[in-house]
């Protein structure tokens, strides 16, 4: 009975994607206009992140966000059964050579960072098909057991191993002799007991957890950033960018700052594609951080 959600997802996954997109239109309308799912949070996040925009821009971006959020939801479910050739066609890649080893050569390890932008579920699958080394996806278990089981099966479909946030250090030490790719979305709000780095992100003093930098120090792996762009409905492109080839040459704070800069640059390219329902700024910075925070960056203009 606890896994009812799992079988509901299985049934939806069996639908053709064209039918699922029709359901997505209904889902977008329900979440934005009927149930108003976190509409206040979305509005606040957009206004605080882009304070110089017009009312028309806020309304248009919010509406586009809910449409794409619904699309990504049904796409993630469809990904459970999507064949590899279709995945590689729907999410093309460039610049991933640092994680791809020619035949006969040792796999190349790395730490792969990204954000909740565009279709991050397909990105996990695509990364596991692209990288030569085994991919370990770091994740937080979902509260619903059925949804969690479905997500684990989907994300691990092409060989990825799913590791919880709490168990990642133990997993890294256990497999330290095997080159691996550690993949994680590092833009979530950290817990109060985690090591935190405060910085400016989207015009706000924001907390980032230091986990990626700690992993880089422990493993000595190069660190990369995966930037996805939405080309059209169900079509994406993932570009691999280098954050640090040798972690020893960069401080942990510098590494996080470079990640944050790439994250913000990516969001500004397609702001409607970020996960604005997330209560990203729920942690308040200490007063000392507020007093020493740099001035707000100049607003980068983007088309509404």
List each language-model region with its residue ranges:
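Membrane-anchoring hydrophobic helices of lipid-metabolizing enzymes
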Residues: 1-114, 119, 148-153, 159, ...
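Non-catalytic C-terminal accessory region of glycerolipid acyltransferases
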Residues: 52, 63, 104-105, 129-130, ...
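Short, composition-biased local secondary-structure segments
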Residues: 12-15, 118-124, 174-187
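Short acidic/polar alpha-helix capping motifs at helix-coil junctions
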Residues: 6-11, 88, 115-117, 134-137, ...
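A conditional alpha-helix N-cap/helix-loop micro-motif detector
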Residues: 89-93, 117, 144, 162-165, ...
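Short Gly/charged-rich anion-binding patches and loops
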Residues: 7, 41, 122, 150, ...
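Catalytic core of membrane glycerolipid acyltransferases/transacylases, capturing the structured
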Residues: 107-166, 178, 191-200
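Residue-level detector of family-conserved "landmark" positions at structurally sensitive sites
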Residues: 22, 56-57, 138, 165, ...
């Amino acid at each position: 009975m606890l896994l009812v959600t799992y079988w509901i997802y299985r049934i939806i996954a069996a639908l053709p994607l064209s039918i699922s997109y029709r359901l997505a239109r209904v889902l977008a309308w329900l979440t934005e206009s009927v149930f108003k799912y976190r509409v206040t949070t979305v509005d606040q996040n957009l206004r605080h992140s882009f304070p110089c925009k017009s009312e028309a821009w806020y309304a248009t971006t919010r509406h586009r966000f809910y449409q794409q959020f619904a699309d990504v939801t049904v796409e993630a479910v469809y990904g459970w059964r999507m064949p590899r050739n279709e995945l590689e066609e729907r999410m093309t890649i460039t610049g991933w050579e640092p994680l791809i080893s020619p035949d006969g050569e040792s796999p190349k390890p790395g730490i792969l960072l990204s954000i909740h932008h565009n279709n991050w579920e397909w990105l996990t699958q695509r990364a596991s098909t692209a990288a030569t080394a085994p991919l370990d996806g770091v994740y937080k278990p979902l509260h619903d057991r059925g949804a969690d089981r479905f997500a684990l099966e989907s994300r691990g479909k092409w060989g990825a191993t799913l590791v919880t946030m709490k168990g990642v250090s133990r997993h890294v030490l256990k497999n330290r002799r095997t080159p691996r790719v550690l993949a994680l979305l590092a833009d979530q709000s950290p817990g109060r007991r985690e090591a935190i780095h405060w910085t400016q992100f989207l015009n706000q003093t924001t907390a980032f957890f230091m986990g990626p930098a700690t992993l880089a120090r422990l493993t000595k792996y190069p660190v990369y950033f995966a930037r996805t762009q939405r080309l059209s409905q169900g079509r994406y492109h993932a570009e691999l960018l280098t954050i640090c080839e040798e972690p020893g040459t960069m401080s942990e704070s510098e590494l996080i700052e470079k990640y944050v800069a790439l994250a913000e640059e990516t969001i500004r390219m397609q702001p409607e594609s970020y996960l604005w329902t997330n209560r990203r700024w729920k942690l308040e910075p200490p007063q000392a951080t507020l007093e020493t925070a740099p001035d707000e960056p100049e607003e980068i203009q983007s088309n509404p």
